[in-house]
Amino acid sequence: MAIACAAAPGLRGAEPFNGAALATSAKSSSAMKMSFESEIGAQPPIGFWDPLGLVADADQERFDRLRYVEIKHGRIAMLAVVGHITQQNTRLPGMLSFKENLAFADSPNGVAAFSKIPPLGTLQIILAIGCHELFVVKQVEGSFPGDCTTGGNIFQSAWDNMSEETQASKRAIELNNGRAAQMGILAMMVHEQLSNQPYIINDLAGAAYQFN
């Protein structure tokens, strides 16, 4: 009885059920999802895949933000994979730290390399990334997510000369490669922590690497 009385004031001020409004909202959400299913990146063999429902009720602005983040992470992961493979037998000449008498050649492969970087070196890396994020690699207003071109270079000219179909294909390829790279660099890092061998591909192929 007490619970019923406590709920009564809230019920008195409640609006009547509006089935038409609910149906309109559901239809709008469904139409928005359908529009995302035709976006670049929703392609065979997986198609539109959103198991966490991140864009279930999202508008175009929210979708574009998530797509920009996905592209950025994919680009970083692609650089990470290339860097991870390149450093297996390659080191910069000279010293990493004169104070600690540490040469670049003294750095091990993989994640273990971070343990050799002095604090000031780590700070330099963070500052360099921050400068690129804030001042260099910036989203072009009014363009598609991930367009950070600044103009005035040969790459921009080559891009502008491509047809819309070719540009769409290139963007889809970048998305797929970025997604694969994110899984790839994570797999290599996990493999290294499990076996202390940073290069699973080299191990499977029997290829040697100099630094470890």
Curated annotation (Swiss-Prot):
TM ranges: 76-96, 117-137, 178-198
Predominant location category: plastid
Molecular function (Gene Ontology), one example: chlorophyll binding
Keywords, ordered alphabetically: Chlorophyll, Chloroplast, Chromophore, Light-harvesting polypeptide, Membrane, Photosynthesis, Photosystem II, Plastid, Thylakoid, Transit peptide, Transmembrane, Transmembrane helix
Pfam short name (any one): Chloroa_b-bind
Gene3D superfamilies: Chlorophyll a/b binding protein domain
Presequence positions on this chain: 1-34
Induction text: Levels are increased twofold when transferred from high intensity to low intensity blue or white light.
Its membrane topology: Multi-pass membrane protein
Cell compartments where the protein resides: Plastid, Chloroplast thylakoid membrane
GO biological process, one term: photosynthesis, light harvesting
GO CC terms: chloroplast thylakoid membrane; light-harvesting complex; photosystem II
Stored InterPro entries: Chloro_AB-bd_pln (IPR001344), Chloroa_b-bind (IPR022796)
Family, similarity comment: Belongs to the fucoxanthin chlorophyll protein family.
PANTHER family in the record: CHLOROPHYLL A/B BINDING PROTEIN (PTHR21649)
Subunit: The LHC complex of chromophytic algae is composed of fucoxanthin, chlorophyll A and C bound non-covalently by fucoxanthin chlorophyll proteins (FCPs). The ratio of pigments in this LHC is; fucoxanthin: chlorophyll C: chlorophyll A; (0.6-1): (0.1-0.3): (1).
Function of the protein: The light-harvesting complex (LHC) functions as a light receptor, it captures and delivers excitation energy to photosystems with which it is closely associated. Energy is transferred from the carotenoid and chlorophyll C (or B) to chlorophyll A and the photosynthetic reaction centers where it is used to synthesize ATP and reducing power.
Protein name (database record): Fucoxanthin-chlorophyll a-c binding protein E, chloroplastic
Organismal lineage: Eukaryota, Sar, Stramenopiles, Ochrophyta, PX clade
